Amino acid sequence: CLSRGLGDVYKRQVQVEADVSNGLPSFIMVGFPSAQVKEAQERVRTALKNNGYQFPPKRITVNFAPADMKKEGAGFDVPVAAAVLAAFEMISPQVVSRVMMAGEIGLDGEIHGISGILPIVLCARSLGSRFCVVPYENLKEGRLIRDVPVAGVKNLRELVECLKNPEPYLKREIQEEIPSIINTDMGMDFSDIEGQEGAKRAAEIAVSLSLIHISEP
């Protein structure tokens, strides 16, 4: 799986790969990850467990390449989760090949939006990635780059489904809440004014014209 170092001003991909082997059960990250990226191991492990993905006790090693660039940001959670699932053969390694991914995973498996989606999608375009997987919250922003297929996912279950069958997620519509244009709190209106029928009538007639009111109402 691919991701991108947001702190890198150059379009350099970060390849995330995982391996499982016999030995003392552990979860190790190598390849110059920052302290923030290392926290992904607990988020990912807990999120996978809470969503029914049970792993045998193994030694898990996650590598970030190239190793000469420091990896920063919570956006590596999604590619780490995908790499671990592929390493345990819960998804085929082929489905994560040449796919750009980014997103932060909560302990409940929900995938949260991150900053810097546009550079990630642009990087995917320059690298010729098959498609991008981003948090659903970032889908609208990601699709500003027209010539790159972008899928939005809300949780781990959707991530797995998307990797196995991306077409429905690449065609997914963006559901936006349309704010009401009706203001139910209008404050005072003419019904609150006692008398002054002539002034109110004049205001009604002049509502589409300029009106200057002088003196007390």
Regions found by a protein language model. Name each.
Residues R4-L211, S215:
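Peripheral, non-AAA+ core regions of ATP-driven protein-machinery
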